[in-house]
Curated annotation (Swiss-Prot):
Name of the protein in question: Imidazoleglycerol-phosphate dehydratase
EC top class, as a word: lyase
Pathway: Amino-acid biosynthesis; L-histidine biosynthesis; L-histidine from 5-phospho-alpha-D-ribose 1-diphosphate: step 6/9
SUPFAM superfamilies the UniProt entry points to: Ribosomal protein S5 domain 2-like (SSF54211)
Single GO MF annotation: imidazoleglycerol-phosphate dehydratase activity
Species annotation: Cereibacter sphaeroides (strain ATCC 17025 / ATH 2.4.3) (Rhodobacter sphaeroides)
């Protein structure tokens, strides 16, 4: 069973996250940050990873700790659920078009965190959501999930569309990367013998 259940508590946030890599994309996300919840819904739905996420954060300050810490906890959950990564495809990539926005994602579940995030937003906010938090989330996810993650905006005019295209592109790439490879069912996808 490729599942994980993570609880993380700090002075800034209290988070619980459950994931099932072999799910159907069911989600139950409640962070108190509406736009971020919407993005996380997209991540679950389009990756086919079941995600249940609860976060109580210091939203009286701002959304930063909530968004970043959710990325940390989700990255930890993915790492736990993947185990030794035996039999997975490991790599995933996707071009995601959403109206005016076109985002390319390529990722490697290598155990070596690295983020390249070229997502210039046309404004500092989407409603009340700070667009810089999109990068903060993906940085935390990459670092704590051991993911090499490249995200590039090829075209885009609308901030909401850019953010949503990015989350969906990551979702579709994750879907591909965590998928079991029937031709290499018992193999770790690395010539080093470990990831």
């Amino acid at each position: 069973m490729r599942q994980a259940d993570i609880t993380r508590k700090t002075a800034e946030t209290a988070i619980s996250v459950k994931v099932d890599l072999d799910g159907t994309g069911r989600y139950d996300i409640r962070t108190g940050v509406g736009f971020f919840d919407h993005m996380m819904d997209q991540l679950a739905r389009h990756s086919l990873i079941d995600i249940t996420l609860r976060c109580e954060g210091d939203l009286h300050i701002d959304d930063h700790h909530t968004v970043e810490d959710c990325g940390i906890a989700l990255g930890q959950a993915l790492t736990q659920a993947l185990g030794d990564k035996r039999g997975i495809r490991r790599y995933g990539s996707f071009h995601l078009a959403m109206d005016d926005a076109l985002v390319r994602c390529a990722l490697d579940l290598s155990g070596r965190p690295y983020l390249v995030c070229n997502l210039p937003f046309p404004a500092a906010k989407i409603g009340s959501f700070d667009t810089e938090l999109v990068r903060e989330f993906f940085q935390a996810l990459s670092t704590h999930g051991g993911i090499t993650l490249h995200l590039d905006l090829i075209h885009g005019l609308n901030g909401h569309h850019i953010a949503e295209a990015a989350f969906k592109a990551v979702a579709r790439s994750l879907r591909e990367a965590v998928e079991p490879d029937p031709r290499a069912a018992s193999a770790i996808p690395s010539t080093k013998g470990m990831l």
